[in-house]
Amino acid sequence: MTNHKLIEAVTKSQLRTDLPSFRPGDTLRVHVRIIEGTRERIQVFEGVVIKRRGGGVSETFTVRKISSGVGVERTFPLHTPKIEKIEVKRRGKVRRAKLYYLRSLRGKAARIQEIR
Protein backbone atom coordinates (compact mmCIF):
# COMPACT_ATOMS: atom_id res chain seq x y z
CA MET A 1 0.00 0.00 0.00
CA THR A 2 1.41 3.39 -0.95
CA ASN A 3 1.64 6.23 1.54
CA HIS A 4 -1.21 8.13 -0.07
CA LYS A 5 -3.58 5.16 0.05
CA LEU A 6 -2.58 4.42 3.64
CA ILE A 7 -3.32 8.00 4.70
CA GLU A 8 -6.62 7.87 2.81
CA ALA A 9 -7.64 4.62 4.54
CA VAL A 10 -6.81 5.95 8.02
CA THR A 11 -8.62 9.22 7.29
CA LYS A 12 -11.71 7.40 6.03
CA SER A 13 -11.89 5.30 9.21
CA GLN A 14 -11.92 8.48 11.35
CA LEU A 15 -14.86 10.16 9.57
CA ARG A 16 -18.22 10.23 11.33
CA THR A 17 -21.29 9.08 9.44
CA ASP A 18 -23.97 10.01 11.99
CA LEU A 19 -23.95 13.76 11.27
CA PRO A 20 -26.77 15.54 9.41
CA SER A 21 -26.12 17.59 6.29
CA PHE A 22 -26.12 21.34 6.88
CA ARG A 23 -24.98 24.50 5.10
CA PRO A 24 -24.13 28.09 6.01
CA GLY A 25 -27.33 29.88 7.00
CA ASP A 26 -28.79 26.89 8.82
CA THR A 27 -29.59 27.15 12.53
CA LEU A 28 -28.03 24.31 14.52
CA ARG A 29 -28.09 22.95 18.05
CA VAL A 30 -24.64 21.47 18.72
CA HIS A 31 -24.46 19.18 21.77
CA VAL A 32 -20.84 19.31 23.02
CA ARG A 33 -19.36 17.01 25.65
CA ILE A 34 -17.45 19.07 28.25
CA ILE A 35 -15.18 17.59 30.92
CA GLU A 36 -14.70 19.70 34.06
CA GLY A 37 -12.35 17.95 36.45
CA THR A 38 -13.88 14.52 37.02
CA ARG A 39 -17.39 15.50 35.89
CA GLU A 40 -18.64 15.27 32.33
CA ARG A 41 -21.67 17.12 30.99
CA ILE A 42 -23.33 18.10 27.72
CA GLN A 43 -23.48 21.77 26.74
CA VAL A 44 -25.81 22.92 23.95
CA PHE A 45 -24.66 25.72 21.64
CA GLU A 46 -27.41 27.00 19.32
CA GLY A 47 -26.79 29.47 16.52
CA VAL A 48 -26.40 30.13 12.80
CA VAL A 49 -23.68 28.43 10.76
CA ILE A 50 -21.59 31.24 9.27
CA LYS A 51 -18.93 29.11 7.59
CA ARG A 52 -17.67 25.63 6.78
CA ARG A 53 -14.09 25.04 5.74
CA GLY A 54 -11.72 22.21 4.98
CA GLY A 55 -12.50 18.65 4.05
CA GLY A 56 -12.14 15.18 5.44
CA VAL A 57 -10.96 14.89 9.03
CA SER A 58 -9.87 18.53 9.22
CA GLU A 59 -13.27 20.00 8.27
CA THR A 60 -14.57 22.65 10.67
CA PHE A 61 -17.69 24.80 10.97
CA THR A 62 -18.37 28.03 12.86
CA VAL A 63 -21.64 28.77 14.66
CA ARG A 64 -22.64 32.29 15.75
CA LYS A 65 -25.21 33.28 18.36
CA ILE A 66 -26.09 36.40 20.33
CA SER A 67 -25.72 35.90 24.09
CA SER A 68 -26.74 38.78 26.40
CA GLY A 69 -26.42 41.22 23.49
CA VAL A 70 -22.89 40.06 22.63
CA GLY A 71 -22.07 38.04 19.52
CA VAL A 72 -20.41 34.71 20.32
CA GLU A 73 -18.79 32.53 17.66
CA ARG A 74 -17.55 29.03 18.26
CA THR A 75 -15.63 26.86 15.79
CA PHE A 76 -16.03 23.09 15.98
CA PRO A 77 -14.12 20.31 14.20
CA LEU A 78 -16.83 18.38 12.36
CA HIS A 79 -15.57 14.85 13.02
CA THR A 80 -14.56 15.24 16.67
CA PRO A 81 -15.87 12.73 19.23
CA LYS A 82 -16.55 15.67 21.59
CA ILE A 83 -19.67 16.50 19.57
CA GLU A 84 -22.46 14.32 20.95
CA LYS A 85 -24.98 15.25 18.24
CA ILE A 86 -26.00 18.02 15.87
CA GLU A 87 -29.64 19.01 15.32
CA VAL A 88 -30.72 21.18 12.39
CA LYS A 89 -33.45 23.52 13.70
CA ARG A 90 -34.01 25.66 10.57
CA ARG A 91 -32.77 25.64 6.99
CA GLY A 92 -31.67 29.10 5.92
CA LYS A 93 -31.70 30.52 2.42
CA VAL A 94 -28.46 32.42 1.73
CA ARG A 95 -26.41 33.16 -1.36
CA ARG A 96 -22.95 33.13 0.19
CA ALA A 97 -20.65 30.42 1.54
CA LYS A 98 -19.18 32.65 4.26
CA LEU A 99 -21.66 34.82 6.18
CA TYR A 100 -19.17 37.23 7.77
CA TYR A 101 -21.51 40.15 7.02
CA LEU A 102 -23.76 38.94 9.87
CA ARG A 103 -21.12 40.18 12.33
CA SER A 104 -21.98 43.80 11.58
CA LEU A 105 -25.77 43.36 11.51
CA ARG A 106 -28.04 43.66 14.56
CA GLY A 107 -31.63 42.66 15.32
CA LYS A 108 -34.05 42.15 12.46
CA ALA A 109 -31.41 42.97 9.86
CA ALA A 110 -29.52 39.80 10.86
CA ARG A 111 -32.47 37.51 10.13
CA ILE A 112 -32.05 34.78 7.54
CA GLN A 113 -34.93 33.73 5.33
CA GLU A 114 -36.11 30.16 5.94
CA ILE A 115 -36.36 27.59 3.14
CA ARG A 116 -39.92 26.35 2.88
Swiss-Prot record:
MF terms (GO), sorted A to Z: structural constituent of ribosome
This entry carries the following GO cellular component terms, namely:
cytosolic large ribosomal subunit
* Gene Ontology biological process terms, A to Z: translation
A Pfam family that this protein carries is Ribosomal_L19
Provide the alphabetized UniProt keywords: Ribonucleoprotein, Ribosomal protein
Q: Which NCBIfam families match?
A: rplS_bact (TIGR01024)
Q: Please give the family membership noted in the entry.
A: Belongs to the bacterial ribosomal protein bL19 family.
Q: What does this protein do?
A: This protein is located at the 30S-50S ribosomal subunit interface and may play a role in the structure and function of the aminoacyl-tRNA binding site.
According to UniProt, the name of this protein is Large ribosomal subunit protein bL19
